[in-house]
């Protein structure tokens, strides 16, 4: 009797273990949860109202979130360093009044007024960063105080009046152009470009890696040669400039300089960042996640409005979403340990 030999298997004994790796990565990716929440929200509102799933409504959502989205990019940078900025909406409002009034009264040409607004908002960010890093003071206290400072300056400088009769360059980004089945504003393209730029900076540059390192452990980052003081101040300053860009987008969308603008944008920007999977404890998150979070906020507000839900209940639901998102983040952090 001759023994027959079985040819050796060419497949790796770990093939079955490796096969689901890609699927597992997708399921455990930080943006998977927010993306699933966005799709579920879209499905719910599509079934709840016939007006939701239309090209015109999607265009409206994009227009509504471009301002908060730009604020949320700056907020993401700060939260990644384990900070927070409660002043973003007020700083944006003050920047919008500076730009609008300087241009409307002819004090400065429109482009110079825009540049001044960016410098002013960047200055607020710089001051926040210096107070947080050099004194040092808790980011919550610093930005809460700066919120009141910017709010007061907005009403003082505007004299409680809405600035109208703005020159064309200030509202140009609010103009629309056809794209597929809907219309898109030029300002929306600016916001998307900013998301892409900051996503690249955080994921593919040394500066971005330093931001994550600072959020994970300031002491470890310092021991590894990262200039944490300069980095923190730089992050707050960049965020301030982004608030200035948001001010211009706000003007282009509304066509006026409104001293009452931005009062709910602080909460909305933080909500978008948290819903997008960025940890309030720093060191974990992404601009892509924030982009999804911004869309979640926009879809919820738009869908609830179409359903006739009162604004106070929309605020209530937004608050609940924030608490749930932070709770999930805290639970996942404990499991990771």
PLM-predicted stretches and their roles:
Residues 2-72, 107-112, 226:
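Membrane-interfacial amphipathic/re-entrant helices at transmembrane-helix boundaries
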Residues 40-106, 130-137, 273-288, 320, ...:
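Single transmembrane alpha-helix segments in multi-pass membrane proteins
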Residues 65-75, 90-94, 123-126, 145-148, ...:
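Hydrophobic alpha-helical segments embedded in the membrane of multi-pass proteins
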Residues 107-147, 292-293:
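Alpha-helical transmembrane segments within multi-pass membrane transporters and channels
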Residues 139-205, 231-234, 253-262:
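Transmembrane helix-bundle core of multi-pass membrane transporters
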Residues 141, 222, 227-251, 263:
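Transmembrane alpha-helices
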Residues 197-237:
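Membrane-helix/interface signature in polytopic inner-membrane proteins
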Residues 236, 243, 253-319:
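Transmembrane alpha-helical segments in multi-pass inner-membrane proteins
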